């Protein structure tokens, strides 16, 4: 699952390549839009909204895409070899005189009227990297379902937009609670820190090629992807277990010593509350 900073970087690359330029190539390789031709139109801007990308073109149209797990946008110069995947994985090509943007494996690709963009993104909560960021509303959204596990609430883009699986695990570590802690049991002081901390992490990483949360040289992340290596703070083995149901199930990392709250037992059942 992409993080908000990843999508922000993709939007910036696309904006730098396309905005203000006339499209000389337009090729939508999905049946619904196979006959759509945007050539001759100027790209106005490319804007991220949470994990969604909105490419606006003159004439009041927006190309809406979402990367989800495997999608990507690549930008190529004339004559450069395309390296985003095999040709059958290409979903859309938008080209100008000096750059070509290619969307690979995009699970969501729509064309809508710019005036109706809310149909695609109106359900999203405050965007951590957007102009609509509202920490109080984000926290209110999270608190609206007290029994819900914090990790699942953080991934719900209706609460706040931009957190993916990496930041879910890292935020919970920095707050000192497990991702299975019910939102209603999050101590008030940590709840108050959460929105600001989340925004700080994404803003710090939106211009970096490698995501970092630790500030430690040679160690990029506190827990994500580190199981069963030692915790960077206490030396306890970092653990991993799946959180969520069905298609929403995600590998989730935590330190059983540094993080308080319920966590899966070795057999996978949630219920153990480690001491701090």
From Swiss-Prot:
| One record GO biological process | base-excision repair
Where does the signal peptide begin and end?
Answer: none
Stated EC number for the protein is 3.2.2.-, 4.2.99.18
**Gene Ontology molecular-function annotations:** class I DNA-(apurinic or apyrimidinic site) endonuclease activity; damaged DNA binding; DNA-(apurinic or apyrimidinic site) endonuclease activity; oxidized pyrimidine nucleobase lesion DNA N-glycosylase activity; zinc ion binding
Q: Where are the transmembrane segments?
A: none
Q: What is the role of the protein in this entry? A: Involved in base excision repair of DNA damaged by oxidation or by mutagenic agents. Acts as a DNA glycosylase that recognizes and removes damaged bases. Has AP (apurinic/apyrimidinic) lyase activity and introduces nicks in the DNA strand. Cleaves the DNA backbone by beta-delta elimination to generate a single-strand break at the site of the removed base with both 3'- and 5'-phosphates.
The name of this protein is Probable endonuclease 8 2
